[in-house]
Amino acid sequence: MRADLCPLASLLPPDAADEPETAYYRQRLDDPSLLDRAFAVQVEGSAFLAVPVGGCRKGGYLSVSEVVTGLAARSLLRGRPGFPDVRLSWSPYPDCCHVVRWGARVPYEDDPIAEGRFYGYSEEALASFAKTYGHLT
């Protein structure tokens, strides 16, 4: 979808995202070079990173508060390399975010370490998480 036809969301270069968010991914991803192919998606007044799949990263997501904004973001990411099967998961609850997802389906095993591996986080980042929050690896 052309950006000028989608006023509710726009794609920007990855450096348009906030530095703390970029640093978050840079510190945790097993393959930080994925950030070179990421997009900053500007929605609802802020720019959030959409990190593509690749290597051990099997999927990604972007939370949005409005369905129409999620539909716009989905349209912008669809068909781009590293963003397969872009879809919108609607929240049934009015006080929760809707989620634009891409890649494989998240394995809901109630296991934050498995989920971290799914999102391509490094073993070092997962070990740090486990130590901090007491989860087993």
Question: Can you name each region flagged by the protein language model?
Answer:
Residues 1-106, 114, 123-137:
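A conserved ligand/cofactor-binding region detector
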Residues 111:
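Conserved short secondary-structure elements within globular domains
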Residues 119-120:
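Activity-critical C-terminal alpha-helical subdomain
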